[in-house]
Amino acid sequence: MKKLIALILVALLALTCTACAEAYTITASAPSGAPALALATIAVNQPENFTFVAAETISAEFASAKADFIVAPVNAGAKLYKMGKSTYKLAGVVSWGNLYIASQKENFHLEDMNGAKVVLFGENTINAAVVNYALAQNGIVPASVEYLAGAAQTQALLLTDAEAIVVTAEPALTAAMMKNAAITAYAVNDLYKAATGYEGYTQAALFVKEETIQAQPEAVKAFIEAVAASCEQATTDVEAVANAAVALEILPNVKVATQAIPGCAVRFVNALDAREQIEFTANIDLSQFGGALPADDFYYVAE
C-alpha cells in the first residue's frame, strides 16, 4: 500500500508540474548515472522533457541555460554561480555520497589501507577531497594515493588486480561485485559519519534557473515537490526506481539497479536545511567551490 501511495503521489505531482502553469512544460537535465536517479520516476513518464548527459559535460548544461532544472555536483553549481557563469540556484541536495573503498584482498579491512597504495578516481575533485579527509580523520594513512580518471577505471582495476585497494562508486561497485564475489567494500559515508556525525556529504543537488523562478514560480514549487517524492521512492520503492532507471538507460539492467540504488544515498533535503552540511563539505576543500562559501542568494527559497 505504501508503494502504491508513493507512486500515485509522484504521478500527481508530476502532472501538477505541468498543469500548474498553463502551457508551460518543465525541462530538466542530469548526468547519467547515480545523480539522475533523483529524477527517474518523473522522467520515465515524460522522457521528452528530460536530458541525460555524460557527467563531464554537465557544465555545458549550465552554460546553455536551456533546462529549467539541472542535477549536478553541488560544488560545480556553486563555482559557476560564484563566477557569474550561471543563474541556477540550489533548490535541494539529492545525492549524499555513493563512494566505496573496495578490494579483492582476503579478509580485507579498512586498517589494511595503512601503509598501502590506494587508488582513487577524480584527482582534484570534491569527491577525492572528501575521501582523503575521511581517511585522515579516522587515522588511516596510506603509503601512497594514486588517481585514475573515473569510477569505471577504478572498477576495472578492482576486477583485474586481486591486490588493489580502490575507491569506486555505485553502480560500478555493484556491477563489479556481481562479477567477483571476493570483493569486500566499505562505504566512505561510514567513515565520514564517524568523523563528522553527518549522514553522508552534499554530493549532488537540484538547481533551478533564476529566470524560471521569476516566470513560473508555482511550476517551480510543484516540480521540486515531485523531485522530493521521487527521491523518497529510492528508499520506499526501489523496484519502481530501478525499472525507471533502466527504461531511461540511466542504469544498465534491473538486477544491478535494484542492488545499487540503496547504496547511492538518494534523498531530498531542501536548500536551507542542507546549507550547514553544504558549507561543511565546502570547507574540506574551498578551491572546489571557487575559494569561498556560497553566498546567501545561491540558495533558492520558495516565497
For each of these PLM feature ranges, what is it?
Residues M1-T25, G77, V131, F223, ...:
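Gram-positive cell-envelope targeting signals
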Residues E22-V141, V145-Y147, A164, E170, ...:
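Short, glycine-/small- and polar/acidic-enriched structural segments
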Residues V53, V71, F121-I126, L148, ...:
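Soluble non-cytosolic domains of exported or imported proteins
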Residues T57-I58, A152-T154:
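Short acidic active-site motifs
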Residues N75, Q153-A244:
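Pocket-lining segment of extracytoplasmic ligand-binding domains
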Residues G115, D190-E199, V266-E276:
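Short, solvent-exposed loop/beta-turn-alpha elements that line the ligand-binding surface or hinge
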Residues I213-Q288:
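Secondary-structure end/capping motifs
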Residues E279-E303:
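Conserved C-terminal helix/tail region of periplasmic/extracytoplasmic solute-binding proteins
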